[in-house]
Amino acid sequence: MAIEAAIGVPAFGLFIAMIILGGRVEIAKQSVEAAAYEAARAASIERTQSEAISSGKAAATSSLNDQGLQCATTNVTVNAAAFNAPLGTTAQVTARVTCKVDVADLAIPGLPGTRTITATASSPVDAYRERR
C-alpha cells in the first residue's frame, strides 16, 4: 500500500497542478483578448492618430487591471495608421496586447516560469468621420 501511495500521490498532485495551469492560462488568454478588443475599439473612436494610440494603450491596461490579471510584463501596440486614410476610405485600427503570466508558483518540473500570451484585435474607423 505504501508503494502505491508513493507513486500515486505525486502523480495525482502533478495532474491537479496541470489542471490549475490550464485554467490559469485559459483565463489569461480570455483577459488578454478582451484587452485587445477594448484597445482597438477605444482607439477607433478617437479623432487623431496620437489620441488613438494613447487611448488604446490606456484601455488595454485598464482592462487587464479590471480583470485582475497580473502580468510580469505587458506590451500594448496600437497601429493607428488608419487615421491617415482619406475620408470615404475604409480602414481599421489594430491593437496587439502581449502579457507574460507568471506560473512559477505551480512548481511543475520542466515548466518555464512564465507563459507569453498575445492577442490581436481590429476595429473599423468610421470612413466618413472627420479626422485631424
Q: Each predicted region: which residue ranges?
A:
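Short, conserved structural patches
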Residues: I45, Q49-R132
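Alpha-helical assembly-interface signal, strongest on the long, hydrophobic N-terminal helix that forms
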Residues: M1-T61
